[in-house]
Amino acid sequence: VSHSGEGATSAAQRKLFSELKKRYDKSSFERLHVSMTFKKGLVEGVGSENSTRGRSFLFFALGVCAGTGLGRCFVLRVPENGLIALNVPLDPLRLGSNSTRTTHPYYMARWNDLLATLGIDGELRNPYWDKTKGEMAAACRNPTLLKSLVTDSLSCAHPQYARHMGIKGRGIEHCGYCLPCLIRRAALTAAWGTGNDQTPYT
């Protein structure tokens, strides 16, 4: 189950899914993709929400919606890990409701309480919450495939930045300085050594 609010994210998801389908053609898995953004002024008299806090609820709601379509008990696995999974506030701007808590254990536990209250036979789990991204990359069972696809993946919080700078033709770009980019760079360096991360950073 995937969501995108702009083109760069959607293109990355589509390409990665296509490559994984080709590599693991004997496994049965499909992609449910939802592209959704909200127009400014959608609710009269309410100012626009320029944060991404609401995406926490949206992501899980989409996953639960897909799970209920199976017609049986389901487990929604959310593969987030490391610092981003726990959302440790690094500065005052990240305290309280100023930042998303998409995969924080407390937030996920409240979601499971909500499912139980609503009588939905499903559960949210994050099996990798206690692993760093570097540990996950180093432990990958198919490191060759991971290295071949890593430049097609998108971690950046500002994927449109390269377009605004007039950079074209290099494919998916990462700004290199936002929190997800810094964690990506540290993780791939920890897993593969210095100089082996082929990600283009703007």
Question: Which positions does each model-derived feature cover?
Answer:
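Nucleotide-activated chemistry modules centered on ATP-dependent adenylation/adenylyltransferase
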Residues: 1-202
